[in-house]
Amino acid sequence: MFNGKQIKAKNQYFNKEISRLKSCLSNNQKSSKQIKNLYNKRNNQLTDIFHKLSKRIVNLLVENKIGNLVVGYNKGWKDSINLGKRNNQTFVSISYEKLINYLKYKCEMIGINLIINEESYTSKCDSLALEEIKKHDAYLGKRIKRGLFQSSIGKLIYADVNGSLNILRKVVNDSEIISKIINSGWLFRPIRVNIL
């Protein structure tokens, strides 16, 4: 599990600075050289981080002889959303699509199959109970606090891991393979890796 705190912190810092500078502009002014420079600096730093992250992911796939990478993505995911001042500063301008494009070309170069799949209802459905991934009136498991999912089988799992397994389940319809992954135990002890 890659730690996204560095990306979020950088993005929030730049967005806060840009917002501060915009508040100092006169009414008829839309931008300034300083704001444009900050946008460029943020974009360059995020591009660098995404290149490094995509390279690390692809290297892990090669080291572990994995030929397929499944990625969840919803088109228009962050378009016209308002998550509140703090979350907008942190998340909205992080280009997940850019990361996917870097993964795509790096995977193609070495023959790894990249599968991009939509991820609706993957965070709400209980992956450990193999709950059908669709809209339900009541879901088997539930998120009990930020980042932690309580499965209906009585186990706790990181919410991101639950969602990731469900994204994989949407692509791999083989319940035997999914059961092997669940029974391997690594889902309950993910290793957090810093990007940089």
Locations of the language-model features?
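Positively charged, helix-rich recognition surfaces that bind polyanionic ligands
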Residues: 1-196
